[in-house]
């Protein structure tokens, strides 16, 4: 902290650049005039957006895959527990549990359909007393293991009464009729049906092609009732059996006990309300409306009166389906949009509306649901009933009235309930507090801050506790970013003190999942292809040569969409005679260049309208056929022109254009907040950082600001990154740190000027006006002076950044995974094991591929086992595995990936485990690799790849020093020389590495093969990242600084190493140059010691 006190005389500014798979971080020290003095820290942190190798294809996150594995484990555990409880119930009721091999008729022991025959006989005839109990047990236990489907919202009590034959049972009848031609009797049970079919036909019963298919639990419950009736079992005992067989515990509501209490004084007995609760939706709308102010003639801003508030709240809540704008709100209040202030102000809880007014999101979801019966109920229910239903669906399954309503829904509608995605998260207060605050704000002119003071007696400094910066939100990609930002800011504060300014910039997909970002990329590619086709059409059909601008493409699109008619007057226009016009102009410099504000018009209308809103001009222009009603009619006649244009996109565009045509006020001019992001997660991050650093100025900008800033300052040609000068080249990952440094120096006035420049640029390129936007530096003298001063600061920043680059202190970091993670064995179809007769002899390779460690131990402990040749053939051989004797005539099973026709005697051992009667490979689930030096006259180096499976039993200890026994799959897959050295104590354990570790390598001696050719193009590439362990003796490395996305026409060697396989290097070759394993702290500095037992850097000696 001595350094922090020394720095306190200066000013710290932190910049954060959030991307989809990266976070750029930078800390600057500036003087009193804002001139950068020192670049204290600059790094690019690369992350995987929460998606591992197993989920890369479908963009499935680790969280999703681990959730599937966790639920699979819980399901199996729960199923075992339920079956054990069923056995106890059967014993208590006097039904003995049949032991293996015991059966009604010894002649039927090998009959695969015997349990189906028993179920059929129990329904058709009354069995003797001595057979009745075991038979009922067998049938009930079989049904319990295949009990069928039941809607999770229906209770087990619904099965206690007889039910009609389900649609699943009717479908079974149809399948049997189509397959066998047999017509089943009415009232037949599933057991009878299968026994009848199995007796007479050779068909598959289960599986994807099986005839049994899916059954409803009511069908099996009907069979149990018939069995009990036929065998003389009392109704009470029958009901006990039904409850035990079909018992189910719903997980809904299990997390309510962990919800935090209301933080307001006196409200601690209430839990925080879910954000999907209608009461929170109402509170959010009212609290944002309470922030609104109306600018009056004297320059003062007054709050809305109580009547005005109620008027606006009613307007916003009466129709959640409407796409309202703040212009609509202003018109409802009878004021100009420019006089309505406070639309972008945060409430005291950090809530902030986006570009549009707030709506009741829950109400919109319920009114748009495809569950028609629930939608109808919602529209007829009152507010109290709606709130109860939302709580029932979200967290509280105890409401009996709601349960009855859900139970009455058609079964197909009940099945859709799980697809109903309500707003997630928790409000800061309880439902009771939300109601009190909403009612108070609606009845007075108090905002949320004043309402809290009056109702709960808190002072001006009180605020609800905010989440920690790195607290997870549930989205793996966002959680990665939050954790990185939280750790970095904590390290900056610890090292240099509290920053005065923290600026965050994020790309559009920076706070979304990888799947969403990929879908948006696909949409962008489709749009790009459409634009390419439009450019070809303009050149081919209209004879335009040279550069084709975006304005040309938009003009063609508008012309075709409008049917070659001027939108304003209907006159026929052509490509060369039409002009683009902004329906609603923007106050100040620039224009709103969104597609919904651009239409093709004739020269006469464009010249006459000038910079006037269409609705105002249409009333007084005097041109025939010009009017709001006529223009809207033309818009409603639009039809989509390209295959890639969806009907939803066209409907959205038409709705936006119609709204613009009706508007009578010009768009407000760009202000200093115009470039601040309004994305939900950006607001949340802003709120968390501001709560953690209350004295710090925090702003969150859109990504376009940084791009405009780099170009305006001209720094792309001055930064010494790898790649082409004069443009942002993505081949060098350190460009994220550049962006973070740029956004750290951003100021509100400069952001406003940059936004105005971008708006002018778009307007001039679309309309073909003279390109003057590059000379624009501000609308006032002060703004221009400030902009020029900022340019000077940016040039000085480039010098500081280049100094850090020259010193190799702009770091590229990446987190490493040290804890045990789930594999994908539960999702992979097992491969078949290969059988070998024990007496025929086995090679060492076959023994190392033994399907279990116990089998390997038994084989290698034979007296005639040879480490090179394995076991010779011997007819008197006998081994014991898990207490069972295996003789020479018996068969043992081993892993093998070869075809049945190929010999596996020399097949190399590989990572696999036995599951579900087969085996699955576990190659991707290597936890870490241990580096050993094998001592001798000339020491050699080797590595032991440690599979996660071999560490499960030691998951609560030190995984990197855990003993790896000889029978483990890790040791069996290691190099023979290493296995022997470890056994004889001749191997020295030097340290461990994991995927993601950084290696600093002296590459001067690597001049051959692909790596040599790569280094000719990119010399002095000394920092590499471990990407995998290709074999038991080779590492796969890729350069840390270089990114594949920036490659353009690379050589084959560069393409192979950067984008494809990487540099595959033998561990014994690599260790000869004694590389250093570099572990870094949150600021990117190498860590050589740690009091918290964090991984430290070390050199392979």
From Swiss-Prot:
Domain of life: Bacteria
Catalytic residues as annotated in Swiss-Prot or TrEMBL: 17 (for ruvc-like nuclease domain), 582 (proton acceptor for hnh nuclease domain)
Boundaries of every HNH Cas9-type domain copy: 513-675
Record region (RuvC-II): 468-513
Chain positions recorded as Zn(2+) binding sites: 566, 569, 602, 605
Gene Ontology MF annotations: DNA binding; endonuclease activity; RNA binding; zinc ion binding
Alphabetized UniProt keyword annotations: Antiviral defense, DNA-binding, Endonuclease, Hydrolase, Magnesium, Manganese, Metal-binding, Nuclease, RNA-binding, Zinc
SMART domains found in the cross-reference section: HNHc
Keyword Magnesium carried by entry: yes
Annotated stretches, region: Disordered: 253-273
Gene3D superfamilies according to UniProt: 3.30.70.3520, Ribonuclease H-like superfamily/Ribonuclease H
Region of interest (Recognition lobe), ranges: 64-468
InterPro entries: Cas9, Cas9_alpha-helical_lobe, Cas9_b_hairpin, Cas9_C, Cas9_Topo, HNH, HNH_CAS9, HNH_nuc
Binding-site positions, Mn(2+) 2: 17, 505
Cofactor binding mode and count: Binds 2 Mg(2+) per subunit.
Single GO biological process annotation from the record: defense response to virus
A Pfam family annotated for this UniProt entry: RuvC_III
Quaternary structure annotation from Swiss-Prot or TrEMBL: Monomer. Binds crRNA and tracrRNA.
Domain notes: Has 2 endonuclease domains. The discontinuous RuvC-like domain cleaves the target DNA noncomplementary to crRNA while the HNH nuclease domain cleaves the target DNA complementary to crRNA.
Name recorded for this polypeptide: CRISPR-associated endonuclease Cas9
Source organism: Actinomyces naeslundii (strain ATCC 12104 / DSM 43013 / CCUG 2238 / JCM 8349 / NCTC 10301 / Howell 279)
Lineage of source species: Bacteria, Bacillati, Actinomycetota, Actinomycetes, Actinomycetales
Gene: cas9
């Amino acid at each position: 902290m001595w350094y922090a006190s020394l720095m306190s005389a200066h000013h710290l500014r932190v910049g954060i650049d959030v991307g989809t798979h990266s976070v750029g971080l930078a800390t600057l020290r500036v003087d009193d005039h804002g001139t950068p003095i020192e670049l204290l820290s600059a790094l690019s942190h690369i992350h995987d957006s929460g998606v591992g190798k197993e989920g890369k294809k479908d963009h499935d996150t680790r969280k999703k895959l681990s959730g599937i594995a966790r639920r699979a484990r819980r399901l199996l555990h729960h199923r075992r527990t339920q079956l054990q409880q069923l056995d106890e119930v059967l014993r208590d009721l006097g039904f003995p549990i049949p032991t293996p091999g015991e059966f009604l008729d010894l002649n039927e022991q090998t009959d695969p359909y015997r349990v189906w025959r028993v179920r059929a006989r129990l329904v058709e005839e009354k069995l003797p007393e001595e057979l009745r109990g075991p038979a009922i047990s067998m049938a009930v236990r079989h049904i319990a293991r295949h009990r069928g489907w039941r809607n999770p919202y229906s209770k087990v009590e619904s099965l206690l009464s007889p039910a009609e034959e389900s649609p699943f049972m009717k479908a079974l009848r149809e399948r049997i009729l189509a397959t066998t031609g047999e017509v089943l009797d009415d009232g037949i049970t599933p057991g009878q049906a299968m026994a009848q079919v199995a007796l007479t036909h050779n068909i598959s019963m289960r599986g994807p092609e099986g005839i049994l298919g899916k059954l409803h639990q009511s069908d099996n419950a009907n069979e149990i009732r018939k069995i009990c009736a036929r065998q003389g079992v009392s109704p009470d005992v029958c009901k006990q059996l039904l409850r035990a067989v079909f018992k189910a515990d719903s997980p809904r509501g299990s997390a309510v006990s962990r919800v935090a209490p209301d933080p307001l004084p006196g409200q601690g007995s209430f839990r925080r309300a879910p954000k999907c609760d209608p009461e929170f939706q109402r509170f959010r709308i009212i609290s944002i409306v309470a922030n609104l102010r109306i600018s009056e003639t004297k320059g003062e801003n007054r709050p809305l009166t109580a009547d005005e508030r109620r008027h606006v709240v009613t307007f916003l809540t009466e129709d959640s389906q409407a796409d309202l704008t703040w212009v609509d709100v202003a018109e409802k209040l009878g004021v100009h949009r420019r006089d309505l202030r406070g639309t972008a102000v945060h409430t005291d809880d950090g809530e902030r509306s986006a570009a549009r007014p707030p709506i009741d999101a829950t109400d919109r979801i319920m009114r748009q649901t495809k569950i028609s019966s629930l939608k109808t109920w919602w529209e007829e229910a009152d507010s109290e009933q709606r709130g109860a239903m939302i709580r029932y669906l979200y967290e509280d399954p105890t409401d009996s009235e709601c349960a009855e309503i859900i139970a009455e829904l058609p079964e197909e509608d009940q099945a859709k309930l799980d697809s109903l995605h309500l707003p997630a998260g928790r409000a800061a207060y309880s439902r009771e507090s939300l109601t009190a605050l909403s009612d108070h704000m609606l009845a007075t002119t108090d905002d949320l801050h004043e309402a809290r003071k009056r109702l709960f007696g808190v002072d001006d400094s009180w605020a609800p506790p905010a989440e920690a910066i790195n607290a997870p939100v549930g989205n793996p990609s966002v959680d990665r970013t939050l954790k990185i930002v939280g750790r970095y800011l904590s390290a900056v504060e610890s090292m240099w003190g509290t920053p005065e300014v923290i600026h965050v910039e994020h790309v559009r997909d920076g706070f979304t999942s990888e799947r969403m970002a990929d879908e948006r990329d696909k949409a962008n590619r489709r749009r790009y292809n459409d634009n390419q086709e439009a450019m070809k059409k303009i050149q081919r059909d209209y004879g335009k040569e040279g550069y084709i601008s975006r304005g040309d493409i938009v003009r063609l699109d508008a012309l075709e969409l409008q049917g070659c008619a001027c939108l304003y007057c209907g006159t026929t226009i052509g490509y060369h005679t039409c002009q683009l016009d902004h329906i609603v102009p923007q106050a100040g410099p620039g224009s709103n260049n969104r597609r919904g504000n651009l239409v093709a018009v004739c020269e006469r209308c464009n010249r006459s309208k000038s910079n006037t809103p269409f609705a105002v001009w249409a009333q007084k222009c005097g041109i025939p056929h010009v009017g709001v009603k006529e223009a809207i009619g033309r818009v409603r006649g639009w039809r989509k022109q390209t295959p890639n244009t969806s009907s939803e996109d066209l409907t959205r565009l038409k709705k936006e254009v119609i709204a613009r045509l009706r508007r009578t006020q010009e768009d407000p001019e760009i202000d200093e907040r115009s470039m601040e992001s309004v994305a939900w997660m950006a607001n949340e991050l802003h709120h968390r950082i501001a709560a953690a650093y209350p004295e710090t100025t925090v702003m969150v900008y859109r990504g376009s600001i940084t791009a405009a800033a780099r170009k305006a300052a001209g720094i792309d040609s001055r930064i010494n990154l790898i790649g082409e000068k004069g443009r942002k080249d993505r081949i060098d990952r350190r460009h994220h740190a550049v962006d973070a440094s740029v956004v750290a120096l951003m100021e509100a006035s400069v952001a406003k000027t940059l936004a105005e420049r971008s708006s002018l640029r778009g307007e001039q390129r679309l309309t073909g006006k003279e390109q003057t936007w590059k000379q624009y530096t501000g609308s006032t003298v002060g703004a221009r002076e400030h902009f020029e001063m900022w340019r000077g600061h940016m040039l000085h920043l480039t010098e500081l950044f280049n100094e850090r680059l020259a010193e190799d202190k702009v770091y590229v970091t990446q987190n490493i995974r040290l804890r045990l993670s789930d594999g994908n064995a539960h999702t992979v179809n097992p491969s078949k094991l290969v059988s070998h007769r024990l007496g025929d002899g086995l090679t060492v390779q076959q023994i190392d591929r033994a399907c279990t460690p116990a089998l390997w131990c038994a084989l290698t402990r034979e007296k005639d086992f040879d480490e090179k040749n394995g076991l010779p053939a011997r007819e008197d051989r006998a081994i014991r595995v898990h207490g069972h004797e295996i003789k020479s005539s018996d068969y043992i099973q081993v892993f093998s990936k070869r075809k049945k026709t190929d010999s596996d005697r020399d097949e190399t051992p590989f990572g696999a485990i036995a599951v579900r009667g087969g085996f699955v490979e576990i190659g991707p689930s290597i936890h870490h690799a241990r580096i050993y030096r094998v001592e001798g006259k000339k020491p050699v180096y080797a590595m032991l790849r440690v599979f996660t499976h071999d560490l499960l039993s030691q998951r609560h200890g030190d995984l990197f020093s855990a003993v790896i026994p000889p029978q483990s799959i890790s040791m069996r897959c290691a190099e023979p020389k290493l296995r022997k050295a470890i056994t004889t104590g001749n191997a020295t354990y030097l340290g461990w590495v994991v995927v993601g570790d950084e290696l600093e390598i002296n590459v001067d001696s690597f001049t051959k093969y692909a790596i040599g050719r790569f280094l000719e193009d990119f010399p002095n590439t000394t920092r590499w990242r471990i990407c995998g362990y290709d074999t038991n003796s080779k590492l796969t490395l890729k350069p840390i600084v270089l990114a594949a996305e920036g490659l353009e026409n690379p050589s084959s060697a560069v393409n192979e190493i950067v984008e494809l396989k990487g540099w595959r290097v033998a561990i014994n070759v690599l260790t000869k140059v004694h590389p250093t394993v570099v572990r870094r702290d949150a600021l990117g500095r190498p860590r050589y010691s740690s009091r918290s037992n964090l991984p430290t850097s070390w050199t392979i000696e």
